[in-house]
Amino acid sequence: MLKGEKVVLAYSGGLDTSVIIPWLKENYECEIIAACINVGQGEELKYIKDKALASGASKVYIEDVKEEFVKDYIFPTLKAGAVYEGKYLLGTSMARPLIAKKLVEIAHKEGAKAIAHGATGKGNDQVRFEVSIHALDPSIKIIAPWRIWDLKSREDEIDYAKKKGIPIPATYEKIYSVDNNLWHVSHEGGDLEDPWNEPKSDLYDIITPPDKAPDKPEYVLIEFEKGIPVKVNGKALEPVKLIEELNAIAGRNGVGIADLVENRLVGMKSRGVYETPAGTLLYAAHKELEYLVLDKETMRFKDLVSQKYADLVYNGLWFSPLKAALDAFVEETQKNVTGVVRLKLYKGNVINAGVKSPYSLYNQEFVTFGKDEVYNQKDAEGFINLFGLSLKIKALMEMERKDMDEAVGR
């Protein structure tokens, strides 16, 4: 047991972790070190220290890692073009390994033998946290209350919190599970558990519903250097500010909503509604630039890498050797991903409105429908003959066999 020992709790101030503090003290008789890792949660962190102490924590860490989150987690994933199941831009998935890393650092600093988290036994986060923690320090014990305690639902948690006098943001009527960081806001649970239910218009936190967005389109310029966004509308911005600026621009135009029934790592399907305004713009712009500067074979292979990269991140394998190897490949592909992309935003839509790069592989002289001096169209005949030779031979052989069969009366 951990009686008298220190336990570091991944603390968010939400429903799950709010009830975990008194539960751990009651069941383990341990000292709770609450660790809130700031990946851009915003206003919800305002009173989090007082709340954690009032709930029974002996000490509270609040670590601002937004810049590290963008530079070392968001940008590598963006450069990889990783998207899970065609829609999910991995906002929660990317944040978990960074949070796990900081929890391990705090545990080492405090001499704690265990780390606790509030992820449920049905979800992906339990895997992401625990695999990441043990990749960094396999000796640390992990406590996952959701897999142990008698509280079987969020309603049970609300009752427990009221019993312990703990203020919580959730109610019986609004019991969405919300994850909020600089990159996205995710919504799960409640009426969203039925895929037939349309998300309510007041669900969204950072995006204007598309039907309520401005009636006039807005243009935005995004400049990249070696796959990394560096300027918005000609203005150089630090990574965190750049994400915040694009969140505002995309959000007011209704851009960045993804409603997805996804395949969880643990084997079941779940529904999530994601708000990723800046990410939606950056992925769109980055891809348009890659279309311009990458050769065909690299693009095709990178598409395969992007899918595998997304699976690794989603499944909690951020610190795996394979991901490190894929990072090396991705980095090589990004050497010429430099240029400017212009996007047109209108009521939830993102439309390419122009792209340019000093490393463009597009040559207008070769593709023009007008008169040109560089391409001899007669050359296409020989190419077509060789390109289709295998099919031509196959057809000839089939015709010969058919003639032979007819000759012998088959």
Curated annotation (Swiss-Prot):
* The enzyme's E.C. designation: 6.3.4.5
One Pfam short name: Arginosuc_synth
One of the GO BP terms on file = L-arginine biosynthetic process
Q: Would the keyword ATP-binding turn up in this protein's UniProt record?
A: yes
Positions bound to L-aspartate: 120, 124-125
* GO molecular function annotation: argininosuccinate synthase activity; ATP binding
Cellular component GO terms, alphabetically? cytoplasm
Q: Which domain of life is it from?
A: Bacteria
Q: Which PANTHER family match?
A: ARGININOSUCCINATE SYNTHASE
Q: What is the protein named?
A: Argininosuccinate synthase
